[in-house]
Regions:
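N-terminal small/glycine-rich loop or linker at the start of catalytic domains
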Residues: 1-10, 62-75, 109-110
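Histidine-acidic metal/acid-base catalytic patches
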Residues: 1-30, 54, 94, 100-102, ...
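N-terminal substrate-binding region of glycoside hydrolase catalytic domains
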Residues: 25-44, 64-68
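Conserved beta-strand positions in the central sheet of alpha/beta enzyme cores
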Residues: 35, 62-64, 105, 142, ...
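Glycine-rich, proline-tolerant flexible connector loops at the mouths of alpha/beta enzymes
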Residues: 35-54, 110, 114-115, 150-151
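Short acidic, glycine/proline-enriched helix-loop-strand junctions
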Residues: 44-63, 123, 139, 264-267
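Active-site acidic/histidine proton-transfer and metal-coordination neighborhood
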Residues: 75-176, 186, 268-272, 295
């Protein structure tokens, strides 16, 4: 795959805007896809949102249910009861499937007060249920693992190897992966090798970069502005056969979450962020082609 990479925007990282505004930002930045957050539907139905995307020439990419984790978290919407959460997630999958997205995102959520083994077991059972609902709706899932250094509010699964093990435990090794660059950077000494090996299982790459040192979980950078080594990652993805979307998702606290970083990316206009994200992707992509040529790959 040497054609230009497919670029999309994730609505989770556009917290102040409407779907209409996000569509304008996507088109203005050169993106051809948008990962819709069900939480932004408001009083619109899925068919309304699908029509808006179609009119703008945008593909629905890795869409996000209003409840996106199996286990409850203070940072993630939804009830405390796991069964109720999973039921709402299944409803979200059915609604989002009407957009014909490339996939729908899910994650475990944190263990909370549950013993770690019990939390993992409950999450695996929930994933199995959600995957069945996704099968019925005709849409793939993308399962996201998290960064081990900041696990308490989002996940019980950390890194690519743990993610594939978890999916096997759930009896659904066919479920695809969400590859978040910020979360996976530094997760394994074999990251590039694993990226190449698992590329066929990756549905979407969440595009961002890593500040070093990272101050908090919401201190991410636009692609090309950090130390993640995007060209090597992109080369490995391409060599492994990945042909999916690069979905811009940069969380950078401007004060709303308690860390008012003076250099927060979120202090930039949303359209400027999206344009710079696209430019950074293309620069790193071209560098990855040059890297592969030097390596003879």
């Amino acid at each position: 795959m040497t054609q230009a990479p497919k670029y999309s925007l994730c609505e989770l990282a556009l917290p102040d805007t409407t779907i209409e505004q996000d569509i304008e930002i996507a088109v203005g930045s050169g993106a051809t896809g948008l990962s819709i957050d069900e939480g932004k539907f408001g009083d619109r139905g899925p068919q309304d949102v699908a029509a808006m995307l179609s009119a703008a020439g945008l593909q629905a990419v890795a869409c996000i249910p209003a409840v996106m984790s199996f286990l409850p978290s203070r940072r993630i919407n939804g009830p405390d009861d796991i069964g109720e959460r999973v039921a709402l997630m299944c409803e979200g999958v059915r609604r989002l499937a009407e957009l014909r997205p490339t996939s729908i995102l899910c994650l475990t959520g944190p263990a909370g007060e549950l013993p770690s083994a019990e939390a993992r077991k409950r999450a695996a059972e929930a994933l199995h249920t959600l995957a069945a609902a996704a099968d019925e709706a005709g849409v793939p899932l993308s399962f996201e693992s998290f960064r081990y250094t900041d696990p308490n509010d989002y996940s019980v699964v950390f890194g690519l190897e743990d993610a594939t093990a978890f999916l096997a435990e759930a009896g659904r090794p066919d479920v695809g992966l969400c590859y978040d660059i910020w979360h996976l950077w530094g997760s394994s000494e074999r990251l590039i090798e694993l990226t190449r090996e698992l590329a066929p299982r990756i549905n979407v790459v969440q595009l961002n970069d890593v500040r070093e040192p990272t101050r908090t979980w919401d201190d991410r950078l636009l692609p090309g502005d950090g130390v993640a080594g995007l060209p090597a990652i992109f080369a490995a993805l391409r060599q492994g056969g990945f042909d999916g979307w690069f979905d811009l998702e940069v969380f950078s606290d401007d004060g709303r979450w308690g860390h008012e970083f003076p250099d927060s990316v979120w202090k930039l206009p949303w359209l400027e962020q999206a344009r710079r994200g696209h430019e950074g992707l293309l620069r790193a992509w071209n560098e990855s082609l040059q890297l592969a040529a030097r390596q003879g790959a």
